[in-house]
Amino acid sequence: PLIANDAAESIRTGVIQSLSEQSNTLADGAATLQVGEKTFPHLQTLNGFYEVDETKIAYWTQWLQHLLKVHVEPTCAMCMGAVVEWLKSQSSEQKVLVILSGGNIDQQKMLKIWQDDHLQKVPSLLI
Protein backbone atom coordinates (compact mmCIF):
# COMPACT_ATOMS: atom_id res chain seq x y z
CA PRO A 1 0.00 0.00 0.00
CA LEU A 2 1.24 3.46 -0.85
CA ILE A 3 0.73 4.74 2.70
CA ALA A 4 2.61 1.76 4.16
CA ASN A 5 5.41 1.59 1.61
CA ASP A 6 8.34 0.37 3.69
CA ALA A 7 9.00 -2.43 1.19
CA ALA A 8 8.98 -0.12 -1.84
CA GLU A 9 11.26 2.37 -0.10
CA SER A 10 13.59 -0.47 0.87
CA ILE A 11 13.77 -1.63 -2.76
CA ARG A 12 14.44 1.94 -3.98
CA THR A 13 17.23 2.58 -1.48
CA GLY A 14 18.72 -0.91 -1.40
CA VAL A 15 18.54 -1.12 2.41
CA ILE A 16 15.68 -1.99 4.75
CA GLN A 17 13.67 1.12 5.57
CA SER A 18 11.36 1.45 8.57
CA LEU A 19 8.15 3.42 8.94
CA SER A 20 8.03 5.66 11.99
CA GLU A 21 4.50 4.53 12.90
CA GLN A 22 1.89 1.96 11.93
CA SER A 23 -0.19 3.13 8.96
CA ASN A 24 -3.97 3.04 8.80
CA THR A 25 -4.16 1.38 5.39
CA LEU A 26 -7.13 -0.69 4.28
CA ALA A 27 -4.59 -3.36 3.28
CA ASP A 28 -3.63 -4.15 6.85
CA GLY A 29 -2.22 -7.53 5.80
CA ALA A 30 0.64 -5.67 4.14
CA ALA A 31 1.09 -2.99 6.80
CA THR A 32 4.42 -3.68 8.43
CA LEU A 33 6.84 -1.21 9.98
CA GLN A 34 9.63 -2.81 7.97
CA VAL A 35 10.32 -5.85 5.82
CA GLY A 36 12.18 -8.69 7.47
CA GLU A 37 15.84 -9.49 6.92
CA LYS A 38 14.89 -12.86 5.42
CA THR A 39 12.23 -11.37 3.14
CA PHE A 40 14.22 -8.42 1.80
CA PRO A 41 16.66 -10.43 -0.38
CA HIS A 42 13.68 -12.07 -2.10
CA LEU A 43 12.07 -8.68 -2.76
CA GLN A 44 15.31 -7.52 -4.36
CA THR A 45 14.97 -10.20 -7.06
CA LEU A 46 11.66 -8.77 -8.33
CA ASN A 47 11.47 -7.04 -11.72
CA GLY A 48 9.22 -4.32 -10.38
CA PHE A 49 7.17 -3.11 -7.48
CA TYR A 50 3.80 -1.34 -7.47
CA GLU A 51 2.43 0.95 -4.81
CA VAL A 52 -1.37 1.06 -4.70
CA ASP A 53 -3.25 3.95 -3.11
CA GLU A 54 -6.22 3.60 -0.77
CA THR A 55 -8.77 4.60 -3.42
CA LYS A 56 -7.64 1.77 -5.70
CA ILE A 57 -7.67 -0.68 -2.78
CA ALA A 58 -11.28 0.29 -1.99
CA TYR A 59 -12.17 0.21 -5.71
CA TRP A 60 -10.90 -3.33 -6.23
CA THR A 61 -12.31 -4.58 -2.91
CA GLN A 62 -15.74 -3.37 -4.02
CA TRP A 63 -15.46 -4.73 -7.55
CA LEU A 64 -14.16 -8.15 -6.52
CA GLN A 65 -16.92 -8.41 -3.92
CA HIS A 66 -19.48 -7.36 -6.53
CA LEU A 67 -18.23 -9.72 -9.25
CA LEU A 68 -17.36 -12.76 -7.14
CA LYS A 69 -20.00 -12.34 -4.40
CA VAL A 70 -17.38 -12.92 -1.67
CA HIS A 71 -15.71 -10.64 0.85
CA VAL A 72 -12.17 -10.26 -0.46
CA GLU A 73 -9.36 -9.24 1.86
CA PRO A 74 -8.35 -5.64 0.95
CA THR A 75 -4.70 -6.74 0.78
CA CYS A 76 -5.64 -9.15 -2.03
CA ALA A 77 -7.63 -6.41 -3.73
CA MET A 78 -4.48 -4.29 -3.56
CA CYS A 79 -2.71 -7.00 -5.57
CA MET A 80 -5.45 -6.81 -8.21
CA GLY A 81 -4.82 -3.06 -8.50
CA ALA A 82 -1.10 -3.69 -9.01
CA VAL A 83 -1.73 -6.37 -11.63
CA VAL A 84 -4.04 -4.09 -13.61
CA GLU A 85 -1.38 -1.35 -13.62
CA TRP A 86 1.19 -3.89 -14.80
CA LEU A 87 -1.14 -5.17 -17.54
CA LYS A 88 -1.58 -1.63 -18.85
CA SER A 89 2.16 -1.53 -19.59
CA GLN A 90 2.19 -4.80 -21.55
CA SER A 91 2.19 -4.80 -25.34
CA SER A 92 0.85 -8.35 -25.74
CA GLU A 93 -1.73 -10.54 -24.05
CA GLN A 94 -0.58 -11.92 -20.70
CA LYS A 95 -1.78 -14.64 -18.35
CA VAL A 96 -1.77 -13.61 -14.71
CA LEU A 97 -2.70 -15.44 -11.53
CA VAL A 98 -3.99 -13.38 -8.61
CA ILE A 99 -4.65 -15.38 -5.46
CA LEU A 100 -7.61 -14.01 -3.54
CA SER A 101 -8.47 -14.77 0.06
CA GLY A 102 -11.26 -13.28 2.02
CA GLY A 103 -13.29 -12.57 5.04
CA ASN A 104 -10.81 -10.69 7.19
CA ILE A 105 -12.38 -7.21 7.14
CA ASP A 106 -13.50 -5.50 10.31
CA GLN A 107 -16.67 -3.41 10.33
CA GLN A 108 -14.88 -0.03 10.43
CA LYS A 109 -12.73 -0.89 7.42
CA MET A 110 -15.77 -2.20 5.55
CA LEU A 111 -17.57 1.10 6.18
CA LYS A 112 -14.54 3.00 4.91
CA ILE A 113 -14.30 0.78 1.81
CA TRP A 114 -17.96 1.43 0.94
CA GLN A 115 -17.89 5.13 1.87
CA ASP A 116 -17.75 5.98 -1.86
CA ASP A 117 -19.46 4.03 -4.64
CA HIS A 118 -16.66 2.79 -6.91
CA LEU A 119 -18.99 0.49 -8.85
CA GLN A 120 -19.94 3.39 -11.12
CA LYS A 121 -16.53 3.14 -12.84
CA VAL A 122 -16.22 -0.18 -14.68
CA PRO A 123 -12.74 -1.79 -14.60
CA SER A 124 -10.71 -1.29 -17.78
CA LEU A 125 -7.19 -1.81 -19.06
CA LEU A 126 -7.34 1.42 -21.04
CA ILE A 127 -4.80 3.98 -19.92
Describe the residue ranges of each PLM region.
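Glycine-rich phosphate/pyrophosphate-binding loop at beta-loop-alpha junctions
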Residues: 1-45, 88, 92-127
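Active-site-adjacent helical/loop segments in soluble small-molecule enzymes
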Residues: 36-93
